[in-house]
Amino acid sequence: METWRCVRRGYGRCVAGRGRYSMFPYPLKSLGRDWTTPWEDLQKYCWRRHISSCLRWPGHYSRAPYPYFSSRHFSLNCRPPFLFESGTQFQYYNWRSDHLSNASLIHLSRHVMTSDRDEPLSKRRKHQGTIKRNWEYLCSHNKENTKDLEDRNVDSTCEDREDKFDFSVMSYNILSQDLLEDNSHLYRHCRRPVLHWSFRFPNILKEIKHFDADVLCLQEVQEDHYGTEIRPSLESLGYHCEYKMKTGRKPDGCAICFKHSRFSLLSVNPVEFCRRDIPLLDRDNIGLVLLLQPKIPRAASPSICIANTHLLYNPRRGDIKLTQLAMLLAEIANVTHRKDGSSCPIVMCGDFNSVPGSPLYSFIKEGKLNYEGLAIGKVSGQEQSSRGQRILSIPIWPPNLGISQNCVYEAQQVPKVEKTDSDVTQAQQEKAEVPVSADKVSSHLQHGFSLSSVYSHYVPDTGVPEVTTCHSRSAITVDYIFYTAKKENTAQGPGAEVALVGGLKLLARLSLLTEQDLWTVNGLPNEHNSSDHLPLLAKFRLEL
């Protein structure tokens, strides 16, 4: 990776020149190591010579303690408050890249600090306060919209019925320690002690214990920590854990953990998005799909599909993101498919690295996407400009992937009910190919699920955008809980071809926060919240 350095040339002008050193010449392996930064020396040098203008560019302010922007959850419109002049309000763009303004970037090759006294004031401040997150109850007859988080009795506000199964689901990107250290520039606003795993894990475990969700969908679960700390701790809380590590040399993966007192495990279905025989799919992201059966005092109960994923981050590779999503949806369709054409309820969680209103997000909710003429950098809504980017190819993925434009496996075997000699011939006849659009070069993607988002992504009363991640370079929404909602006299959507058995009713959700809220406690991570993501939590009702 080429880096940029600042060079002073005549009249105090600063131009960008290519440096021959990597941006991170000494990888940060321990957060206890001293940090050094030539930026502050350069800043003082320029200030003394009245050439501070050489360090300015659109979007830059002199009070900023760092001069460049990041690569992880990048958003030009989201910066810590001390990057803004007084009175400047954060503008949450309408998730369209053509609404974003261009900005010049200057990168320095070193960005670490020498000692505590060199830390910015915002970093040295201790924020002992916490922000209370409220439950938002969504039952139509509920007179009270929200209650304090400490009030755990959700059922008291909702309709009480015998033929029901209520359960809660949490989605939480817990921030892999290796990824934190490899991307330490994203956490320069943090005090170093709060970044140590020995400090973070007890906080994360405390959150999990407090919320006491029936199902956990965790992302960025580091393999070594999972085996030695995370899994044993969760098992002691009554969870059964399933884990899928990313392929290649990636240190983390996804886990789905459920209370074995509430569910039985029917199947585990990992999904590897990397396919060595397909050049497009050279990334190591994964998904994990579980089929669970509620433990209820009935002879038979409908199963529930829980899916968890962490899609590729790269804002300019929307083609890979869409293909990864299609692979996950195909596996979900395969797991939930029934002979009568119905599908069991689905809860799909994860870090989708896409913003609300983006083409990828809209595809999940609407069940269809026409990607003709769409630039690959606009798929996730993270990229500000499509200049220099190619248009998505038609089709996006090659035929040998084995997934149709309807996001199902092109050939799948329908399992027979009984294994008898007379069924041998029948089993061969039951091999059926899922119908695929006759137009093999169609630019239309579809999927057969009617999915809704647990969150509306805006604060109801003010319209201020909610965020699920907040660090030194970004404050946006990338984490979601999608579910197949119970249809109650609603218009048929793109996923109407799937007849839901029961469906899910959203009872309550744990409120999210705004960027302004989070910076009152110095962003994420902080003394009380030990990931750069907020946990998402929802309570559902399965009507039997």
Curated annotation (Swiss-Prot):
Belongs to the CCR4/nocturin family. One of its GO terms (biological process) is negative regulation of mitotic cell cycle. It comes from Mus musculus (Mouse). PANTHER family: CARBON CATABOLITE REPRESSOR PROTEIN 4, PROTEIN ANGEL HOMOLOG 2. InterPro entries: ANGEL2_N (IPR045816), CCR4/nocturin_mRNA_transcr (IPR050410), Endo/exonu/phosph_ase_sf (IPR036691), Endo/exonuclease/phosphatase (IPR005135). Pfam families: ANGEL2_N, Exo_endo_phos. Transmembrane segments: none annotated. This is Protein angel homolog 2. GO terms for molecular function: catalytic activity; mRNA 3'-UTR binding. GO terms for cellular component: Cajal body; mitochondrial matrix.
